[in-house]
Amino acid sequence: DGQTFIPMPLVVSAVHHHLIVKKLRSKASIVCISGNCIEDHHFAVLIALGASGIYPIGSYKTIQKYHPESDFYISLDNYRHSVEKGLLKIMSKMGISTLTSYHGSMLLHAIGLGERLSKEYFPSIPSLIGGIELEDIEKTLKERIRLQVGNNNSWSLKENGLFRYRKSGEAHGYSPTVFKKIQYLGTSGKKPNNKVNDDRPIYIRDLLCYKTSRPILNLEAIEDSSSILKRFGSGGISFGAISEKSHRELAKGFSLVGARSNTGEGGEKSDRYSISNDDISVNSYVKQIASGRFGVNSEYLAAANEIQIKIAQGAKPGEGGQLPGFKVSSMIAATRSSSPGIPLISPPPHHDIYSIEDIKQLIYDLKDVNPRAKVSVKLVSQPGVGIVASGVVKAGANIILISGADGGTGASPLGSQKHTGFPWEYGLAETHQTLYANGLREYVTLRVDGGIKRAEDIIFAAILGAEEFDFGTSALIALGCVMARQCHLNTCPVGIATTDEKVEKRFKGKAENVSRYLESISESVRNELSKIGKTSLHDIIGRTDLLKINKKQENLVKNKKIDLKAVSYTHLRAHETDY
């Protein structure tokens, strides 16, 4: 009959706010009967929008269909328990311990919702790059039903590959095609015949392109590869999350080309420190300090060229970290000053940092221990990060790292992988613009990480304000990672994300795989610079006037009503980029 259902979040939020306006909200509960409320994220959204109770009829019917009557109540209890654990995890990210406090809190962000839709139905939830309106949602839902039912009324559902990659499903940033190309770069050093990335847009930067010049500059006029490589670094990947051997090879791979290696939050074996080891290539350039303070002592800090304070992780902000007990071997325990077999948890907050004054004190103390080391602070890309970054610069940080949601660990919960964090494009642009507006930009180096794997990513990040660039997942892929996403199980098929000595024997990666990958990216960056008509990365930092909408994506941007002004806002004249 041409009608369709109304999405439950839309209904709940509309009713919730209407009752508030009429001063009737406290007199009634809102109970949802929903067929598409399945994951913990779905429950969290409905509760945050005002739902008092949820009956996930679709989930219950599915459990009933696939489990015999004798197991139904056990399976139902397991499902409810997993949803409850997920909700507790989500609430804890905001420091909330009771469901009553989370109820109607509107503690959400939106990406891709139009301004009219947000103001009318989701007030107080910012939607930062524009997007679809009510009529677009209706059109999409009707089209889905038409495609699903077809002419034969078949209701069999296709797997859309939301979590596990499927060739005909949702596009993934690290699809098998992509990681095979990265590994090809790591083994051969030669660029594959086709691009590293999928043609389908996945990131905000895929909607943009940069202006090119005619004629293209000769490569001899472009800064050499070694200068570009000095701007590269490793993401913080801890010893414990990955094996000791792969951690060494990763550090060595970055050191071989003059790039920065990073310990991650798990400390480092003292035999790798440059003060006690002639082979300084395995001494991580950056020593990270996280909330758990694992492996942190004066010797560790003294061996650092840079000390990084990790406030949060872009892939799972507000979550902290956890190393399961079965991954805590005697070697890990010794390095982290712990006991074998005991789970190690980094809490979401630093319990000695509750203000800018606290972080200023920590920076002062770290510089007191190691005066020659620079101090960087890792912040998460999100709305408002620019103001926080300004305070951190005033507190004495030398480097600000903006971490995006698109990188991160294969051990992250599935809900965090899909529904937590912000693209680095937004946080980086806001931070650069805020620092510039407050006269602080010249006092700090801006760095970025989170899903960086191509030369084009480097160019876009530089245009949005970054001077340095960190590779995490892509560097591990060059080392041999096959994206099995079982890092937390200690059963890595290629012996990287494991502390089991038997499993570690599968590891075949070499430092040269990483160095070749980085060298290939740096050469590709030189090629891109020649197309733009600039001789160095320095010349394009903050030059958002070089951006324009990608012609291939013009229809998508128009149809989805996407507004990229927040990302590509230009406040600099061509001669004002001297950082």
Tell where the protein language model's regions lie, with residue ranges:
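Active-site entrance/lid segments in N-terminal catalytic domains of soluble metabolic enzymes
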Residues: 1, 10-16, 196-433, 437
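Glycine-rich phosphate/ribose-binding loops and adjacent secondary-structure elements
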Residues: 1-85, 90-99, 109, 114, ...
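Conserved phosphate/anionic-ligand binding catalytic regions in large, soluble enzymes, centered on
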Residues: 45-52, 94-103, 240-253, 259-261, ...
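Mobile "lid/hinge" segments at catalytic clefts and subdomain interfaces of large enzymes
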Residues: 61, 318, 326-336, 475-537, ...
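Amphipathic alpha-helical packing elements
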Residues: 85-111, 524-548
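Polar, glycine-rich mid-to-C-terminal structural blocks
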Residues: 108-140
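Conserved acidic/glycine
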Residues: 138-139, 144-211
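Conserved small/polar residues in nucleotide/adenosyl-binding loops
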Residues: 570-579
